[in-house]
Amino acid sequence: MHIKLVIFAILLPSSLLLLLMGTTNFQQGYVEAQTNSTQVFTSPNHTFSLNYPLDWEIAPRNSTFPYYGETTALVLRPIMNETVTPLNEIFFSISVSDVKRLLEDNKSLPAEFLDKLVADKISSFEDPSSIYGNLNVKLLGNNYTRLGDHPAKELTFLTQNLGTFEVDTYTIYNDQLYHVNFMGPQSKVSQLYEEFQQIKDSFRFLS
């Protein structure tokens, strides 16, 4: 599982590369053993699947930590032997939203929609009225990538006043906006970024 970070050198911006170097009973889906090190999650409507490590778990919906929103389809987190707090929380989430009407109203192609979505988020980093406005956000990467063999956009940034590292990946598939989010303490990035990439790379659309 510990793949040398040099593998990612040609794929990551230099600032990010330097940073890297320095509930089984889930009612809305199911998991099954796949190998000795991962298990499979398939969404309840069989629209996507992914693999995640055995030392991760599906976050419970009744948790005191606000993992789930209206559009959240899945949240994964490492199994921890300590109390979870906003300062040590690590998670990988997938949210799905219907954007068919927005695409039609704006007469936008999916790629154009994603470009604007990402541009607006970057602008919010400097907007005092936004949730990021006073958090001293440092942008590490704004790149094209793929999610489930589908074109995607990816933002990587530090929220320096909170000490968190975050990756947002967006793609549109069948008029649905898929948002993959990874968040964790900046101090643990080098330990967990590879696992995040492995989970993301295993993502597949099923229908």
Cite the ranges covered by each PLM segment.
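Hydrophobic membrane-insertion alpha-helices, especially the h-region
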Residues: A9-L19
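Sec-dependent signal peptide cleavage junction
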Residues: L19-T35
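Conserved polar/disulfide-associated segments of primarily extracytoplasmic proteins
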Residues: N62-I172, Y178
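N-terminal "mature-domain start" segment
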Residues: V31-V75
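Soluble non-cytosolic domains of exported or imported proteins
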Residues: T47, S108, E112, Q186, ...
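Extracytoplasmic/secreted envelope proteins and their assembly/folding machinery
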Residues: P53, D115-I122, Y193-K200
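N-terminal Sec-pathway targeting helices
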Residues: M1-I10
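Surface-exposed amphipathic alpha-helical segments
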Residues: W56-I58, Q176-S207
